[in-house]
């Protein structure tokens, strides 16, 4: 039975290690040298003229007649990054956005309240089109008469009243109007910003003063390269999914990684559905387009010349002569804060991905946030949540520790039985079972409670890993960022020492090999945790300390009870 217990623990350790390695292999962003950036010319929408953005009234992101046509310099809507249009800047209290007037699209979005690192206070660029990175948000009118369609002249050049716009003190909303006109049709592309919001409403107002009906499809897309997640810090377990997501009423959360786009070929991944949204997600942050109409949207992916596109196309609409029509969508570019995302769109909060144990993880997250609202320190909130979880499992843990203490108490008798029966395993097992029955010991009592608690521990791991609130959140003293490793490895070493102390309270396995494995486990875990985020290590350290206190109390109580019984018997 000692062998079974040890095998269970070692098996869990090995499986956890292999899962971490496999998960990092699948989820961690692949480094892509800048030299591999596509050399083709790209328009401000992030698309080549042959396929990505321009579609007629078929509601497709590319078309049969253009999909096979390679991008050429003669295509009317192609311009290199260097020849982009005039850039205007919009600044709110949380966002700094750059809009290219050649197409009127977002080519940079900086998150003002999220510095790159503690040492670099420069705001994090969620989107950008420089420094070897291509990540933009485009919205356009394509199809029969759409100004953005290549056959109609390609990207329109918009005019703005100012070069820069700022949300002033006391101002709750800021509107930025971009105007263009062609053949009697005037289009006003309006960006609407709100105070303390990462949501941007994008609206096209089409005023048709021509003599003919004007037809187009509204389209919105996110286009990016495969550049690595800037928030990825490396190390065991520190990766998060980097790729696309599509949400529909039928499938609220479907992840599409870059390899899926590569394997899907020219046709891409296509889904037709009303409502929903599309997004690119990374660790802590997300960009998403949310359609505002209840029409049937065609959600689709594309891969062209090293750029990955996730977008949607709405059905064709018609603006009669003398009429005005409005179409648009909502763009979100910001942190993955569950409460905020719920308000932006249904199921957008699922981008805070707690994994397959989300049913347990989500309540843990809500409790952690509730505690933080009172104490104001995420490190203290983690400690108090750990105490609360330990209290909930107090009786279950007590059962486990009581079983271990009883096993420890009868270890000398178990050793005597092994020596007495030697290689006669059948008689030895019989004698062991009689001993367990006599002493009322369940040999698996120390393992099963541990297994029952594992889902909670794993869920809390994901909660701490996915919570953007822990990013650059200080604890005390040298811990100034709970989302990265302890810079001096103090917490992992303390955790290793606590684990070593805890193993000394467990019954010593009679087999020398098992005993050596048990002694090595604290060292192995310490090495693992050296690169874990400090918040996770803090949780394990506090959990170990509480476990030691509970186990020591129960062990001493049982051992003292056994001594008292012996004195009475004598």
Curated annotation (Swiss-Prot):
The chain crosses the membrane at residues 230-250, 378-398, 444-464, 487-507, 522-542. One of its GO terms (cellular component) is plasma membrane. Residues 31-60 have a biased composition (Polar residues). It comes from the Bacteria. Required for the insertion and/or proper folding and/or complex formation of integral membrane proteins into the membrane. Involved in integration of membrane proteins that insert both dependently and independently of the Sec translocase complex, as well as at least some lipoproteins. Aids folding of multispanning membrane proteins. Interacts with the Sec translocase complex via SecD. Specifically interacts with transmembrane segments of nascent integral membrane proteins during membrane integration. It comes from Hahella chejuensis (strain KCTC 2396). Its main location: membrane. One of its GO terms (biological process) is protein insertion into membrane. It is a multi-pass membrane protein. This is Membrane protein insertase YidC. GO terms for molecular function: membrane insertase activity.
